[in-house]
């Protein structure tokens, strides 16, 4: 019903425009009001070429839309600020791939990545953190609705368009890959690697005051 409502709303409000994108409000308000998480529906829309950004990230939605146009494929939006554990790097990455620990990070979001960009064991589950916050860690009810699993390995392009506090549009773009390394975690998640990511994170993402969301196109563009 939620998916059909969004599609109907888009059709009714796009006017003469051909394409649409959404920037939805999700946690914590959505599950408490509607009784489920919107992530899986968001992933289905993204699979259809209708990008959906989490947490009312308008420029994230615009970034996704740009990637969808360029790649002519499904895209996603992920947190870019989660580290790969040193023990995981030592065990599964070091010596097997040409990356340093600081080149790697966990690309993560609750469960909005299209199923076509995830590994075969993906499944609809529940949001672990919100279950702890909203349901005291009990049997999941209103926190169900995430699409969880590891993101499929392959080439990616990470990018974002953003307006700064002076009203100036800025952007970044970086090419890398999702490594074939099990994350052993929850959500829609993957072990990402971008050469010199540590320097890029410090001197571009932080110094230029970019948000922690990055759009992902699957391939090098």
Set out the residue ranges of the language-model regions:
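Anaerobic metallocofactor- and corrinoid-dependent redox/one-carbon enzyme cores
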Residues: 2-221
